Amino acid sequence: VVVIETKAPEQGRLQLSYKGDFSVTMADLTDYNLMNSSEKLQFETLAGVYQDTNHSMANQLRLDDLRNERLKGIARGIDTYWLNEPLRTGFTHRHNIYAEGGEEKIRYGIGLSYGEVQGVMKGSDRQTIGGNIDLIYRTGKFQFSNKLTLDYQKTNDPAVPFSEYAQANPYFKKYNDEGRIDRYLYYYQDPELLETEAISNPLWNAHLNNYDKGDQFGFTNNFIIEWFVAKDLRVRGKFGITHATGTTDTRLSPLHTDFDDLEETEKGLYTHSTTKRTNYEGDLTATYGRVLAEKHMLNAVAGFNFNATKRTANGYKANGFTDDQFGAPSFANGYPEGGKSTYSESQPRAAGFYLNGGYSYDNRYLLDFNYRSDGAS
């Protein structure tokens, strides 16, 4: 066993340290070799996009008019670059401060950290807060140590994926002639078949009251006691507890184009989920090692350990929102058709003990013994 300890601070003095990290992140779009508007229209023409496969004269005239209309727009200079819309320059900063001190028998340390990370996607960010308390106390043949860490994280993610911007055609305009965002880049409904062709505008969905956010909180506490019974015998006990809670909430506005084909009482979607996890673990170990007559080496390790974990998860979905701004689940009409709230729970446990022994004579003849028993539920 190798034990490494950091250099102790000067007795009776408080030592402070600070560390800061700052960075700037930008998206690399060199791998996106997308066609311009003229190239894309030519590609679609060669691919038969503007050819009616059912040999309908009326529909062929419509497709010809559609291609000519897009060709006129290209001639007027329409060549839209969509990839820059959801992107930004991300700034990140992290700070960590740690204070430590102590005397001959006791050492302590207190730390605090804070960080903000901006993603290159607009609406993508992460905030982290952490803390830790370290204590070590020595008296006689005993040493006590305790380490507590706490972590909190808050996240936000964009509701419209980057792929929707990459798939938008360059011959479409981002805004209409009045400078407003249209719901669709292209919309057509067949008057006879009542079939609809629609291409949604990613800027429309992005400006709605959508969100995808979450927060997590957790802590870990480890307590260790060591008893140096004799030069050849040491007993060590450890008990630890870990707890973590996570919550996620996502919401799509009833004005989102995903709900265009649904009834008013089914538009919009709110999703909530919560997870909890608590873990207890401990072990007790006795270690013995001795050399007799410079040739006989004896060593033995005996121990007992246990572990218990409880996990729970619950969640639900709600739909039927009547307004873009009213996003709380209390404004929903109810569960989606066939939907209901969910809940799950599990509690695995395990325990075991072991005995390892060894004998060596003159570093030439070796004898090892190992025994272990485990149980779990």
Give, region by region, the residue ranges found by the protein language model.
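Periplasmic N-terminal accessory/gating domains of Gram-negative outer-membrane beta-barrel systems
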Residues: 1, 79-90
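A beta-strand signature from Gram-negative outer-membrane beta-barrel systems
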Residues: 1-19, 92-94, 107, 115-118
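Outer-membrane beta-barrel initiation region
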Residues: 31, 53, 85-90, 99-103
